[in-house]
Each structure stands twice: as C-alpha cells, then as structure tokens.
Amino acid sequence: MTKFWKRSRVTKALTDGGRAGSFEEAEARLNKVRVDVVLGDDQLATAAGQAAALTAVATARKCFGRVTLVMAGDAPLITILPIGETVKAAARRLGARVDTHASKLATHTIRIGNTPAGARWNVRCWWDRWLAGTRAFDDDRIGDSRLSVSGVFAGAVAVRQVFACVLAGRDIPVRDATVSLWTSWQRASMDEIGPERFDVPDKLWLLGLGHLGQAFVWTLCFLRGEGERLVVLQDNQKISEENEATSLLVLPGDEQLGEKKVRVADVWLKQAGWETSLIERRHVGDVALGDDDPPILLSGLDRLKPRLVLAKHGFPFMIDAGIGHGAGDFEGIQMRTIVNGKPPAGLWSEPAKAEEIEDGTKGLLDRPAYLELEQHVGECGKVSFAEASVAVPFVGAATGAIVIGQAIRLATLEPAPVFLQMELGAPDMATLGGLTEAPHSNLGSFSMRL
C-alpha cells in the first residue's frame, strides 16, 4: 500500500497515542534506536541464554529496523530451528548484524549473562528456572538457565523496556521485574523457582497463526522434545506485508509473502521434531473432535465471536490468549482457560458495538498523523490504517511464554488460571480470576527433567 504500511502496526503505538505527528515521524523515532544485544560466554550455550538472545534480536529488529548481536564466540543451537545451526547463523537470518565488540553508536544495550555495561542505557535479562524478567543492575546473578521459556519472556520484556523509552521520547529508568512463569498470578518469590521436572503436552491444537499463534510456535520450538509429538495447525490466512513487523516466524525479506501461515508454522515445528496436521480453513465450530485429537487448544484469534464459538466446542482444555488493540492497551495480556467447552458466565466482556468501533476509527482520522497520511494513501488508505490494530512483537513473544507455561502446568496435572490479566509494563502485578480444577487424567505428554 505504502512504505508506511509495513511497520504500521508498530508505529500506530506512537501515532494513535498522540506521541508522533505523522507516520514518517514515528518511523524516524524508531529508526534512531540502535540496540546491542550482548550475549556473555556464560550464557552462550544455555537454553535460556539462546532463547533470550534470539527473542531480543527478533523483536528488536522488527521494532527498530536493525539490531546487533555482540558475542565473543559461537555455539550450536540447543534446539533445531530452520534459521541456522548456530547462534550466530540464527541471529543473522533473523536480520541481526553480528560483531565481537559493542558498537559506539548503540543507544540501548540488552545484556545477557556476564557482560560489560555498554551504551548509556542498559537492561539485563534475568532468570532462575521458572522466574524471569529484567534487572537494572548486576546485584542479582542469573540462576538456573536450563529453561528456554524463561529466556523468551526475559528477552521480550527487555525489548519492551527499550520501546518504552521511544514512547516516552526520552530514556527512562530500567525497571526491575520478576514473573514466575509457573504461577504468573502470584508475586514472585526468589525462594520458589518452580519445578525441575514437569510434563510437556505432546498433542496440541493451535488455532490462529498470526501475531499470537506464531509466538506459541516460537516458544514451543525452543523447548527440547522427545518421542512422538503432534500439533494441529489451523488458519486460513496468508502472510502479508505488515506481518513481518509483528509475527516472529516471518523472516526479513519477501520470500514468505503470500504463503499460508499454517505452512510457515509447519516448517518451524517439523524442524523442531513435531509432526503436524494442517487445516487451511476457519474453525466455525463444525470440526468434530475425535478421540485421537489434541486435548488442549491454544487460541490466538483476534476477533471475539469465533473465540466464543470455540469456547463451547468441547475441547477438554482451551487456553485463549488475547491482547489489547489500541495505543493505550496494546501491552495488556489476557489469558482464559475453558474446561470441557463450558466457559463460566461473564468470562469475556461484552464486545464493543459496531458504532463504538466506528466512532473510535473516526476519532483517529482527524488526528494530524492521519491527515498527513492521506496525502500519501488517499481517503480509503487512511481508513485502512485507522482500522488496523496496534501490535508489537515483544508483547506476542511474552504472551507465548506465558501460554506455553500454563499448557505445561495442565500437562503436569496442575490447575491453570480461569482468567489471568497482565500489563507488560508491570508484569509482576498480574491479577487472577480463579483457577480451574486440576486435570483428572493424563492429557498426553512427555516428561522433561532440566
């Protein structure tokens, strides 16, 4: 449509929030950011270290247009990914520049492991098994680094803190944050780092393979697996230009444009050792469930109506993830768990009425950024921009880590949140709306011992 369309879902966080007077200004603000992701030798060959580095690289590159991975050596990837056999090769395929020394031009540094302070603004990724987050200083040493899910979350939150500086128009202090991905609704205790041994689902049904669905796949692929494992992938859409900036599996370049999203996800999962079954059509509640079908559905759909249909479809467990769509709530994460197709009353708010959505769109059209945009794309193009939601890749990545963590809880026969709400700006202050009953029987899983 226009050069501004490709990254529009990200730049709308600035234009729609009144933080930039034009889409051109918003892109210029993002392009000024130069992130160094510095990976220390002590974390180079760990599951969490590799996941954090590549998540930070992928999400920073999508937000800011460039990123540098700084590392003294190299190491084979612990899991098999379709982007290379080593950390260095994978980072380059994700669009990063790789160097052995920090850049003097870096504006922000994300540090992973024992590394020297870099740019004037630094944030450290931190974790200890199921605990994950960020630190401003070196007081807390990284703990157990064998769980990749924690690395994914920490890398995403670190990039979120860089993005917060762009929104504020200045560098803001780094915020210490700690979340337990095992019990995300509780205030994290440094003495409770979660289990060393747990079960991982070996059968999953993933519905919706856009921003959130691809984040589920991303996190799954970083988990080591064994034995026969199956994922049913369902989506009817194709990769389009704006997906590169928001979706973790869409790589730099135009090679994937026009491909079905299920086929892109299929490549990643097969490489990681999963068997796949593809359904390239929408699920409107008409697909009968068989005894051999996956008992856990992970839903990453945008629209509420199909989610409500699926909530009553009868999956033994459905984990539904949703995120905010506007400039004021795009960092908000909601997760719901529905048991046996019986969602509790009031689990979802009433959907916005059509006239309310239309009023919100009209409210954007008169803003300076959209009036200036009209000169480039015309009236129809301006409306298309206004109707699109705000979406940033680090929110998807963080959501993927939370959802996969809770799917693992279910497979381990532990209860999961009926409703969980988290704001990524303050992830350690999540709220809980009750817990499901623990599963009464094995859902199909393989045991993992760190």
Per-segment meaning from a language model:
Residues 1-450:
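Adenine nucleotide-associated cytosolic modules
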